[in-house]
Structure formats: structure tokens, C-alpha cells
From Swiss-Prot:
Superkingdom, taxonomy of origin: Bacteria
Gene3D superfamilies registered for this protein in UniProt: PurM-like C-terminal domain, PurM-like, N-terminal domain
GO molecular function: ATP binding; phosphoribosylamine-glycine ligase activity; phosphoribosylformylglycinamidine cyclo-ligase activity
Species name: Burkholderia vietnamiensis (strain G4 / LMG 22486)
Name of the protein described by the UniProt record: Phosphoribosylformylglycinamidine cyclo-ligase
GO biological process: one example: 'de novo' IMP biosynthetic process
GO CC terms, sorted: cytosol
Localization per Swiss-Prot or TrEMBL: Cytoplasm
Similarity comment: Belongs to the AIR synthase family.
Keyword terms, alphabetized: ATP-binding, Cytoplasm, Ligase, Nucleotide-binding, Purine biosynthesis
Length: 351
């Protein structure tokens, strides 16, 4: 069969003509290999660039259960585009997934990322992946693979989207599922580093209304840097705590805030009563509430309000847990207690 004839003056088309630059993709791989190499740990059986990534479950596990999580960064990326600040969203991406699998007692083992854009900017993508690798280092997990998708016409110039995938392992007998939580247990709150990666659609609406100078000083750093502070990763201090005492339950405070995430680990019939005066509301959340006219109840169901992770322990273990986490560099408060629910009551109430 003869190929179709083209017009005499027609030029042959290339993938680059269609908007996809294979050379740019290759250049990105070369740039990110050193970042990924720094995250290598026992169990990694291959390098970046293969069709699939190989990982051997550590032999220390007798009955390993794999725990997986996936997430993105949400509309925090829109603020990153506006500020042309791409160095922190990679850590956000890792944190959202590794903190999620941590609450079941899992040690993060490896991470993969997906970077999608309309036109690939190698420097921007490399900056993002460098942040992802940093997040993996903070989590003790390996960055073993990923996908960069350049899709002309799918995203505006200068914009991209991210997705991350984490896999960890926990000993079957040590899975944390909240089943042992009972009345009298104590809820500890670990400080967040800021807004983390949830609620940014409301944040952006408040910024639109208030029209602040994002470069202005805000309690020692620019408002922009305060808003973009990367999500805190709690993996290492909490894995260490689990080796010393019984952690009955944990809740990563993400979308839905304190009042919708803590109930996810409570059995029916139990309520966590939180004292909103037990920890300080950070200045950034006060600023958001003031400039947005946001009600207290809405703040508690949208933002973390200064608490990025809730940890539930027996009352007898609370002081030891606080001391251990404080020594590891965390700010911790007793923010509430678990009790029997009253009729018709929500499973988490803030008083």
C-alpha cells in the first residue's frame, strides 16, 4: 500500500510541531536522577527510567500488610503559579500521601509522582521534583518512579497538575485502626506548619477579597511564604513513638478539618471533645478568619486551625507521648478527650 501523497510544498511534521518536546523530557530525567538517588533505601531493586519500579518488602516484617495512598496538592498550585514559586509543592505532594498511610501505622516505603502539563518547562518541573525528593527524604521513603505527561492544549501555559502515590508496610498485628480507642483516652494535637494543602479555594477567595500585598512581612516572613509553607511530614517522630508506647489512633487533619477527620478513627458511640482554647490559633488562621469573615464552625471544617495531626493515646501515656514528640521537635498539646457520645451528637465537637 502506497503512503498518501502530500502537497509538493508540505513539510513533514514532527512531535515537536505538535507541541511535545521529547528532548525536554529526556533533559528532565537527567536533571532529576540525582534527586531521586538521594532517596534510595534498602529494598529498591532498580533505578529511575525502567518500565516498572521494583521494591522488595523489608525482611524485618513477618506478616507485612501493604498500605497505599494517593493524593494531590489541590488549588494550592494556583497560588504557586501566581507567585512563580514551585520549590515547596513537591513536599506538599509527598506529605499528603505519607501522612495518610502513617495513621494506619505504616512505614512509607516508596513514592511515585505524576506531573502533567501543557508545555514542559524543564526547570520548573525539576524544581517540583526536587521538592518531591526532599519530602521523600523527610519520610524515609524512596522516590522510585514517576510520569511526566506533556499534553498540548490540556493546561494553560505555565500551569501543571500533580498526583502522588505512596506505598508503605505495617506488621499485620500492629495495624492502627482505632478499634481500641475508648472513653477517657486523650487526644493530642501536633502543630501544623501552616495551611498545609487543604482549603486553598477559600484561601484564594479571601485573598481576592482582601487584596493584600503578598510580599509584605507577616510575622517574620512574607505573607506569600507563610501561605505556601509546605505541609509538615510527621512520619519519623510518630514511627519512633509507636515503638515506645501504644498509639490507639491517628487522624491526618486534611479536607474537612478537625471535625470531619477525627471521627474517621472513632468507633460508633464515641465522641472526641476538643477544647479550642487548648492550643493557640496561629496568626495566619486569624488573618484568614478576619479578612474572610469566616465563622468558627466553618474554620473548623475547612482548615486544620494549627493542628496537622491528631494522636489518640491512653490517658496514662499522654505525658510520655508529649515528652517524646517534643524531644523530636514537634509542638504538641492535649487538645481533648474521648467520651461516650450523647444522643444525636457529632463524633467530634469543639467547645
Amino acid at each position: 500500500m502506497n503512503p498518501p501523497k502530500s502537497a509538493p510544498d508540505a513539510q513533514g511534521l514532527s512531535y515537536r510541531d505538535a507541541g511535545v518536546d521529547i528532548d525536554a523530557g529526556d533533559a528532565l530525567i537527567d536533571k532529576i536522577k540525582p534527586f531521586a538517588k538521594k532517596t534510595l533505601r534498602d529494598g529498591v531493586l532498580g533505578g529511575i527510567g525502567g518500565f516498572g519500579a521494583l521494591f522488595e518488602v523489608p525482611k524485618k516484617y513477618r506478616e507485612p500488610v501493604l498500605v497505599s495512598g494517593t493524593d494531590g496538592v489541590g488549588t494550592k498550585l494556583k497560588l504557586a503559579f501566581h507567585l512563580n514559586k514551585h520549590d515547596t509543592v513537591g513536599q506538599d505532594l509527598v506529605a499528603m500521601s505519607v501522612n495518610d498511610i502513617l495513621v494506619q501505622g505504616a512505614e512509607p516505603l516508596f513514592f511515585l509522582d505524576y506531573f502533567a502539563c501543557g508545555k514542559l518547562d524543564v526547570d520548573t518541573a525539576a524544581t517540583v521534583v526536587k521538592g518531591i525528593a526532599h519530602g521523600c527524604e523527610l519520610s524515609g521513603c524512596a522516590l522510585i518512579g514517576g510520569e511526566t505527561a506533556e499534553m498540548p492544549g490540556m493546561y494553560p501555559d505555565g500551569e501543571y497538575d500533580l498526583a502522588g502515590f505512596a506505598v508503605g508496610a505495617v506488621e499485620k498485628s500492629k495495624i492502627i485502626d482505632g478499634s481500641t480507642i475508648g472513653a477517657g483516652d486523650v487526644v493530642l494535637g501536633l502543630a501544623s506548619s501552616g495551611i498545609h494543602s487543604n482549603g486553598f479555594s477559600l484561601v484564594r477567595k479571601i485573598i481576592e477579597r482582601a487584596n493584600p500585598d503578598l510580599s509584605a512581612d507577616f510575622h517574620g516572613r512574607s505573607l506569600a511564604d507563610t501561605l505556601m509553607a509546605p505541609t509538615r511530614i510527621y512520619v519519623k517522630p510518630l514511627l519512633a513513638l509507636m515503638q515506645k508506647l501504644t498509639v490507639k489512633g491517628m487522624a491526618h487533619i486534611t479536607g474537612g478539618g478537625l471535625v470531619e477527620n477525627i471521627p474517621r478513627v472513632l468507633r460508633e458511640g464515641l465522641t472526641a471533645e476538643l477544647d479550642q482554647n487548648a492550643w493557640p490559633l496561629p496568626p495566619l488562621f486569624k488573618w484568614l478568619q478576619e479578612h474572610g469573615g469566616v465563622a468558627d464552625a466553618e474554620m473548623h471544617r475547612v482548615f486544620n486551625c494549627g493542628i496537622g495531626m491528631a494522636v489518640i493515646v491512653a490517658a496514662a501515656d499522654a505525658d510520655a507521648a508529649i515528652a517524646d514528640l517534643t524531644a523530636a521537635g514537634e509542638q504538641v498539646w492535649k487538645i481533648g478527650t474521648v467520651r461516650a457520645s450523647r444522643e444525636g451528637e457529632a463524633q467530634t465537637v469543639v467547645v
